């Protein structure tokens, strides 16, 4: 049996823009993606801390260092510019692997600058 396990998350990101006319997705600064091992086209679950909305979409790579978090298409209706969100990826694992896996968490500040990074259950690695 395979289990859906949290793989990584970007915590407390701020939505910087939205584009209703785009086909769909979430554009994320590539530097942030690399820091938590997320990749373009990967499915994400997004939680809006301001209104409780949860939605799924997929990642588009944004410009490295831009600090961009842009919601596109229908996803742009789920959060406003300035809303705080959590972006999560998941992986399928067998139970033995899942019991030992430690997801990577990247915490960002109000400008989406990386503050710290850690595996769940381990000490923060300060980044600024």
UniProtKB/Swiss-Prot annotation:
Residues at the catalytic site: 25 (schiff-base intermediate with substrate), 58 (proton donor)
The reaction(s) this protein catalyses: L-aspartate + H(+) = beta-alanine + CO2
Residues where Pyruvic acid (Ser) is found: 25
Residue numbers binding substrate: 57, 73-75
One GO process term, biological-process aspect: alanine biosynthetic process
Pfam families, per the entry: Asp_decarbox (PF02261)
Entries under HAMAP family matching the protein: PanD (MF_00446)
Free-text function comment from the UniProt entry: Catalyzes the pyruvoyl-dependent decarboxylation of aspartate to produce beta-alanine.
Protein name: Aspartate 1-decarboxylase
Source species: Pelodictyon phaeoclathratiforme (strain DSM 5477 / BU-1)
